[in-house]
């Protein structure tokens, strides 16, 4: 069996590692460096440069030098509008509202650009090993959604790699950190702030098991954003002095970016740095120079919003894991941006202890990926990695409610099925609306896919049984299947790369879910009550029709009166009136049921009201057919 390499496909830099003699080795590239800039350049004559050669020529070729492409992976064009405005290269709206990089009229997908970086990493490994490499473990941010994971897998395939596993970056880092400590019981927090993304994961380690308890983060918070606060400050200062916005010139913008990144790095070890850019731009025919001093204090002031944005995800992750900061034994720093002193200070403040500096933040993720590769080949034994899915998943059901099938922070791989039914007689088709998020109502969550199940046999409402199955594999990629149990017909969907969530949407969902939890609960209870009334009306009318004149006249009149009252309350959607009418109807039905029971005789097994007679005692009664207590009433749309 060939080697499985581990690749950290980063926003700013990438790294490749391989297991040699049970030891992970970080492989040096052809330029003699252990990390490779995630930069691709297209130069005259059709030549393509990747890594350091591409980065070195960026100032003179800004519109054809592509960087931070990871931020575009699996996103729609609308979701990356902020990034489109920031970069000097041209990004246009492509098919299916996807972002495409325009190089002289040739449109490249983010997957294609990422594949070029992966090819560089593949070649680096092949040069070191002296053999062809065809398989890899590739890491992604823990908070990457299904579409972004799928896009990463596609990039690997384009690069000629069979992606054996997609692993979350903090989880890979924990594997590298804890492999030699696997006999100890530990609780660790992995704080991963890279070039473009931020993740926080809480894990338990012990007896070779690495179990993720919770994860949180922001897929658009990283070193790029820290660079941009410096860029904006430099540009605004220059504009106030010279009346010209340097951000409008691609070459000047590229010089600002490099200067900002250099200043940020220097301020991790010094209290101030001079930014000197001669001949930055001519103003009225006169060459102008940019010379400014940036102190660490000023930088921290400029970046304060970004620094504080790291706090809430950490607090949420601790809460979701059922832990307090005192429960955490070690805090591991991952990603180059964790070298910023203010970040280290905020981490210590959040967790109440100084973070461990025992791992290389630039290399530890790739090392963990290589170890996972060794687990897959059998070279590494007695290690079990248990990861989680970051967001809840479900479908839209009657009344616009999101019915969850898989909760956030569920260990993967996982599979969950539920039975649903129809709300219309003789409904031939249903539409399955797949949702992702934490809110109770469908409209407040993110729609990540829709598909139809056709060919349902004609039947009264609530009779068909549609089994919906959510299946998340070890890569965190979702498959949804709908199965009509009567006809055997099946339909499924794999969520495609353009349908995922943006970082802002994820953040908004969780914040709003917390702030509106009580309102959501009340609204859901209201909808549930209306649905119960609807089902009770249906079941009562069905029983009246089936039993006909078997009802004693003196018992039927109260039922008719209560039924009319319930219909009026249901039409008005008055919850209090519904409660009263349902209670009256249930009383009338019970009285009629007793009379029928006496008349028919228990021994004869006559027309007796079953346990669901007029049913509407709770969510599991009137909502469902009397012969199957596991069927949920769903307001599917009829597809004509």
UniProtKB/Swiss-Prot annotation:
Induction / repression: By stress conditions e.g. heat shock.
Any single Pfam family the record assigns to this protein: HSP70
CDD domains per record: ASKHA_NBD_HSP70_DnaK-like
GO MF annotation list: ATP binding; ATP-dependent protein folding chaperone; unfolded protein binding
Keywords annotated in UniProt: ATP-binding, Chaperone, Nucleotide-binding, Phosphoprotein, Stress response
Ranges of compositional bias, category Basic and acidic residues: 626-640
UniProt protein name: Chaperone protein DnaK
Gene3D superfamilies linked: 1.20.1270.10, 3.30.420.40, Actin, Chain A, domain 4 (3.90.640.10), Substrate Binding Domain Of DNAk, Chain A, domain 1 (2.60.34.10)
Bias (Gly residues): 603-617
Gene from which the chain derives: dnaK
Keyword Nucleotide-binding among record annotations: yes
Function: Acts as a chaperone.
Residues annotated with Phosphothreonine modification: 197
Homology family: Belongs to the heat shock protein 70 family.
Lineage of producing organism: Bacteria, Pseudomonadati, Bacteroidota, Bacteroidia, Bacteroidales
Region (Disordered): 600-640
């Amino acid at each position: 069996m060939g080697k499985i390499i581990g690749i950290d496909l980063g926003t700013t830099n990438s790294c490749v590692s391989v297991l040699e003699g049970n030891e992970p080795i970080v492989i040096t590239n052809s330029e003699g460096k252990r990390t490779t800039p995630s930069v691709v350049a297209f130069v005259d004559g059709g030549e393509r440069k990747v890594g350091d050669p591409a980065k070195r020529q960026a100032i003179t070729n800004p519109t054809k030098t592509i960087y931070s492409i990871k931020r575009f992976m699996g996103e729609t064009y609308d979701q990356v509008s902020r990034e489109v405005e920031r970069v000097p290269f041209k990004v246009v709206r492509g098919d299916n509202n996807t972002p495409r990089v325009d190089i002289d009229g040739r449109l490249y997908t983010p997957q294609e650009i990422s594949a070029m970086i992966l090819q560089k990493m593949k070649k680096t490994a092949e040069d070191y090993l002296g053999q062809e490499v065809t398989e890899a473990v590739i890491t992604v941010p823990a908070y990457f959604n299904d579409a972004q994971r799928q896009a990463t897998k596609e990039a690997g395939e384009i690069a000629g790699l069979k992606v054996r596993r997609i692993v979350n970056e903090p989880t890979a880092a924990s594997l590298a950190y804890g492999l030699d400590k696997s006999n100890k019981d530990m609780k660790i927090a992995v704080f991963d702030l890279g070039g473009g993304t931020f993740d926080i994961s809480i894990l338990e380690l012990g007896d070779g098991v690495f179990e993720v308890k919770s994860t949180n983060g922001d897929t658009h918070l990283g070193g790029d954003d820290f660079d941009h606060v410096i860029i904006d400050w430099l540009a605004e200062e220059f504009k106030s002095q010279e009346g010209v916005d340097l951000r409008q010139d691609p070459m000047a913008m590229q010089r600002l970016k490099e200067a900002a990144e250099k200043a940020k790095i220097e301020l991790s070890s010094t209290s101030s740095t001079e930014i000197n850019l001669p001949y930055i731009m001519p103003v009225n025919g006169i060459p102008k120079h940019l010379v400014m001093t940036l102190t660490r204090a000023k930088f921290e002031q400029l970046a304060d919003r970004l620094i504080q944005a790291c706090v809430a995800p950490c607090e949420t992750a601790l809460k979701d894991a059922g832990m307090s900061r005192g429960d955490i034994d070690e805090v591991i720093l991952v990603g180059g941006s964790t070298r910023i002193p203010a970040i280290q200070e905020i981490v210590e403040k959040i967790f109440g202890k100084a973070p461990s500096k025992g791992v290389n933040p630039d290399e530890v993720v790739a090392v963990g990926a290589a170890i996972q590769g060794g687990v897959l080949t059998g070279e590494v034994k007695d290690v079990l990695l248990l990861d989680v899915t970051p967001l809840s998943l479900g479908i839209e059901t009657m009344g616009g409610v999101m019915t969850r099938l898989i909760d956030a922070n569920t260990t993967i791989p996982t599979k969950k099925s539920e039975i649903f039914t129809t709300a219309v007689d003789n409904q031939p088709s249903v539409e399955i609306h797949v949702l992702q998020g934490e809110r109770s109502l469908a409209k407040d969550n993110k729609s990540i896919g829709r598909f139809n199940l056709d060919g349902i046999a004609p039947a009264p409402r609530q009779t068909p049984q549609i089994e919906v199955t959510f299946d998340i594999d070890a890569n965190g990629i979702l498959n949804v299947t709908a199965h009509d149990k009567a006809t055997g017909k099946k339909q499924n969907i794999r969520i495609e790369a353009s349908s995922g969530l943006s970082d802002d949407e994820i953040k908004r969902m969780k914040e709003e879910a917390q702030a509106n939890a009580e309102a959501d609960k009340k609204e859901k209870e209201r909808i549930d009550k209306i649905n119960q009334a609807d089902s009770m009306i249906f079941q009562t009318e069905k029983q009246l029709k089936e039993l006909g004149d078997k009802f004693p006249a003196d018992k039927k009149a109260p039922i008719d009166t209560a039924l009319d009252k319930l219909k009026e309350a249901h039409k008005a959607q008055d919850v209090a009136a519904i409660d009263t009418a349902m209670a009256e109807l249930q009383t009338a039905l019970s009285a009629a049921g007793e009379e029928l029971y006496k008349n028919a005789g228990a021994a004869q097994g006559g027309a007796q009201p079953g346990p669901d007679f007029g049913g509407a005692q709770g969510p599991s009664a009137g909502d469902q057919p009397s012969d199957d207590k596991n069927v949920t009433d769903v307001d599917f749309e009829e597809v004509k």
